[in-house]
Amino acid sequence: LLAALRGQSLGLAAMSSGTHRLTPEERNQAILDLKAAGWSELSERDAIYKEFSFRNFNQAFGFMSRVALQAEKMNHHPEWFNVYNKVQITLTSHDCGELTKKDVKLAQFIEKAAASV
């Protein structure tokens, strides 16, 4: 029974990630838009990366808090690293190992959050 449940949960994860996959055309346009905003593609895996700089730690932490709340709502969590006023963010969809619509949507939110700090 446990093995069957594990199989079902894996199937659901794969199914949910499949609904968020980008078509080649969507991916190309998303990458162009994200690069225009300062994001870069990682060469070692299908992910995007950007470093943000703020005036001080409080601004950086406030930004991270806003992003964390949105990420939790989306059930889609960034990889990030923070030192003082810098926040480095990498986005990818771990369940399918590629860039998805969720990454693009979260990156767009991140841009708005950074601009409003």
Swiss-Prot record:
Keywords: Acetylation, Lyase, Tetrahydrobiopterin biosynthesis. It holds the Pfam family Pterin_4a. Its EC number is 4.2.1.96. The modification N6-acetyllysine is found at residues 101, 105, 112. InterPro entries: PCD_sf (IPR036428), Pterin_deHydtase (IPR001533). It comes from the Eukaryota. The modification N6-succinyllysine is found at residues 101, 105, 112. One of its GO terms (biological process) is tetrahydrobiopterin biosynthetic process. One of its GO terms (molecular function) is 4-alpha-hydroxytetrahydrobiopterin dehydratase activity. The keyword Isomerase does not apply. Signal peptide: none annotated. It catalyses: (4aS,6R)-4a-hydroxy-L-erythro-5,6,7,8-tetrahydrobiopterin = (6R)-L-erythro-6,7-dihydrobiopterin + H2O. Homotetramer. Interacts with DYRK1B. Involved in tetrahydrobiopterin biosynthesis. Seems to both prevent the formation of 7-pterins and accelerate the formation of quinonoid-BH2. Belongs to the pterin-4-alpha-carbinolamine dehydratase family. This is Pterin-4-alpha-carbinolamine dehydratase 2. It comes from Pongo abelii.
